[in-house]
Amino acid sequence: MARILLLTLLHPLPENPARGAFVADRIRLLREMGHEVKVVNTLPRMLKIHEQRRSTMQGVAKAPRQFEFEEHPVLTVRYTAFPDHPFPSWTSASIKRQAKRVENWLGDWRPDLVSVHTLWPAAILAQKLASRYSSPCIATVHGHDIEVGLSANYSSIIIQLEKSVQQLVVVSDKLAVKMPNSVVIPCHVEVPEKLQRPIKKWRGRWRRGELEVLFPANSKRPEKDHYLALQTCRELETRGWRVKIGDLPNVPRNIVHDRMHACDIALITSRRESGPLVAREAIVCGLPVVSVDIGDMKSWLPPHCIAKERTPEALADAVEAVLKSEETIQLPDIFEKEHVSKELEKLFTRLLKKS
């Protein structure tokens, strides 16, 4: 058993239980593996009105200094940042100053490992704490740091952080190509067994029946390209389908799974993804998926589920191909909880032997 201090920019909040659900899954898994985990949620200082800039920021402004999640305490530390980070050195200095508060919160408890989810800017604080406790530091990148951060004005800090941690973990092979010294440990699929369903062949009136489409994201997030999903539904309607489409606006996980059970197909139109966890959850819930060619989708989804082009017509063709198909879709073992826990255990053992 290891004592793990986990810092994360993304974590469920009292007013936003959907924020960072994939990080909460990892924390839960670590505890199931027998590790003792203490969680620090790094958040920017902001006014309530500024939450409207991005739906993922809902609940950030008024998040308490400390709260409980699944009966475990979570410490919130704040840093100062401006939109688009015009002063990255200011942000770095701001988050470093929170180290003392974290140390006071931990008291006599000393971590064997420091783990951080996302590099900018949480890894700056993680590195300082790892140095303070002489512990190895692991950084897990979910996509934004690489796909957006490497072209931002703080890219040099991200490159420096990536080189300074003892191990960089990425969640997909696509990200590993850009970070050659990383190891791939994907996010596992966390769907209760009682909610898991096999995918059944669609039964209905071809090009006349009703089609319930799930847009498995918050439609307000521009990178998810809700407009393309709407265009696809309009194209399906011109072919005779009666289409309804709904999204998932920051709702708890149980409601996500309920919506997946109620719909006929999930439609993913994102402009930027590393490995859409929601697509895997949909498959486990028995909901077929149609997607643009994004992230790692091609590595495990059958070809007929991937649109040949990023157009409403190509996506509508893929939707109809999936509805006709009788092919079963099986998730690879790498997304199973057992595989992920084994890979994490191997990583921890190797790093703790070195330290």
Model-flagged regions — what are they?
Residues 1-63, 68:
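N-terminal subdomain of nucleotide-sugar transferases
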Residues 5, 200-224, 230-233:
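Conserved donor-binding/catalytic core segment of Leloir-type glycosyltransferases
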Residues 149-152, 188-209:
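Acidic anion/phosphate-binding donor-loop and adjacent secondary structure
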Residues 199-201, 324-355:
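A charged, aromatic-enriched C-terminal amphipathic alpha-helix characteristic of glycosyltransferases
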Residues 258-263:
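Short alpha-helical donor nucleotide-sugar binding micro-motif in glycosyltransferases
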Residues 271:
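Aromatic "clamp/platform" in nucleotide-sugar-dependent glycosyltransferases that forms part
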Residues 279, 288-291:
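Short hydrophobic beta-strand element within catalytic cores of glycosyltransferases
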Residues 304-313, 320-325:
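Conserved acidic donor-binding segment of nucleotide-sugar-dependent glycosyltransferases
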